[in-house]
Amino acid sequence: MIFKVKFEVTQMILTSLINKSAKALVIVAFVAAPFLAHADDAQKPAVHVTYEPQLDNQRDPNQYCAKCHKFDKIDKNQTLDQSGGELHFGKFHGAHLDKKNPNNGKAITCVSCHGNISENHRRGAKDVMRFEGDIFGNKKPMYSVQEQNQVCFACHQPDKLREKLWAHDVHAMKLPCASCHTLHPKEDAMKGIQPKQRVKLCVDCHGEQQKRKAEQDKLIEQKDKL
């Protein structure tokens, strides 16, 4: 009888110890789980997250520019494909809109001529190509003649331009293309004027050049007399 009681007591003690041990193991496993997971993650290669902004209208870069450079004199519901080459972004006309680069066959977009914008573009950063044709202005252009014309030469090859008109041989290297050609022509790239009237463009430019030279010579002469 005494042996039986001792055996039952011993069994109860063992059962109690086993239950306590099991509970302790559960607690340890619960506490250690985050640390074990962290250690496992530490062994994995680091994942570098790169921010890649997704631009709307990726298939039509012109629409992305048009978000800020609003349409003018055109139905806002009209798409670029329906514009008939008369799309306006302020002063923009779309003769180039339906064209492709003859050298690579890619469609011409705003980016083709003006380049990609930076993240500061919307804050007013002057980070795109600007074509300035006022050769008599006092303000220095943002981009040199060579930089401006190289953009045009990406499609309009200099050799072919010289063959088409002798004036390109001289002027294309010293003057910006924009001084004679409109940037966003509706039809004719040559200031939108008729061929018979184009000579007036030459006369006006060279006349102004001679006038300014005469004024400069007069000032020099007056200084010499002082």
From Swiss-Prot:
Protein's pathway: Energy metabolism; nitrogen metabolism
Gene Ontology terms: cellular component: periplasmic space
UniProtKB keywords: Electron transport, Heme, Iron, Metal-binding, Periplasm, Signal, Transport
Principal subcellular localization: periplasm
GO-annotated molecular function: heme binding; metal ion binding; oxidoreductase activity
First and last residue of the signal peptide: 1-39
Gene3D superfamilies named in the record: Cytochrome C3, Flavocytochrome C3, Chain A
Modification after translation, per record: Binds 5 heme groups per subunit.
Pfam families: Cytochrom_c_NrfB-like
Keyword Cell inner membrane: no
Presence of keyword Mitochondrion: no
Record-listed heme 3 binding positions: 152, 155-156
Annotated binding of heme 2, by residue: 110, 113-114
Binding site for heme 5: 202, 205-206
UniProt-annotated binding residues for heme 4: 177, 180-181
Cellular localization per UniProt: Periplasm
Positions contributing to heme 1 binding: 65, 68-69
Protein's job: Plays a role in nitrite reduction.
Name of the protein in question: Cytochrome c-type protein NrfB
Gene responsible for this protein: nrfB
